[in-house]
A protein has these predicted regions:
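Acidic/proline-rich low-complexity IDRs
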Residues: 2, 15-17, 38
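Acidic/histidine-enriched segments that form metal/cofactor-coordinating
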Residues: 29, 62, 88-89, 95-166
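Bacterial N-terminal signal peptides
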Residues: 9-19
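His/Glu-rich zincin catalytic helix
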Residues: 22-98, 120-123, 129-136
């Protein structure tokens, strides 16, 4: 069936009118109670407590990503994302994953974009303090565990992910 322009325009206009008429004109206020504070080292912490669930999402977002990298010198944010999952001085190789499994955590992962790098996982509520300690350990005590062999291996992993579009 071929529609003429006037009929199409009329039908299209009616659909737009009805869509606007059906939309709610009153907005529902949505708010989430949270605490926000800044640590002595400049780290901003946003804390929200939800007692309706037995698990807690632990998510860290760092304002660093590929947009801050120079042409010809890219991939560093993603490389650091990988390195931070490997080892720390206090937890050892694979220690973060082992600790997470021991306390019932799941979904540990990370992601890097143009303007941020995220690390996240879910843990039982009673394990939150342990996981925050483990995340702090990961951020503060991984660098001395990185040697040339580890660095080269992770560079290849990141390059491979880039080739695959991951």
């Amino acid at each position: 069936m071929k529609l003429s322009y006037p009929i199409f325009a009329t039908v299209f206009g009616a659909v737009l009118f009805l869509a606007g008429a059906c939309s709610s004109s009153s907005e529902t206020d949505f708010s989430v109670d949270y605490e926000k504070f800044t640590l002595d080292n400049g780290l901003e912490v946003i804390f929200h407590k939800d007692d309706s669930d037995p698990v807690t999402a632990v998510a860290l977002t760092f304002h660093v990503g590929s947009a801050r990298e120079l042409p010809g010198r890219t991939g560093f944010a993603h490389l650091f994302e990988h390195l931070l999952f490997l080892e720390s001085e206090n937890l050892g190789r694979g220690g973060l994953d082992q600790m997470s499994a021991r306390i019932g955590g799941s979904g540990a992962n990370g992601s890097t974009s143009r303007d941020r790098t995220n690390y996240f996982q879910t843990v039982p509520n009673d394990a939150l303090e342990k996981m925050i300690w483990a995340e702090a350990d990961k951020m503060g005590y991984f660098i001395n565990t990185v040697n040339e062999m580890v660095l080269e291996k992770e560079k290849q992993v990141v390059k491979n992910e880039k080739r695959q579009g991951v």
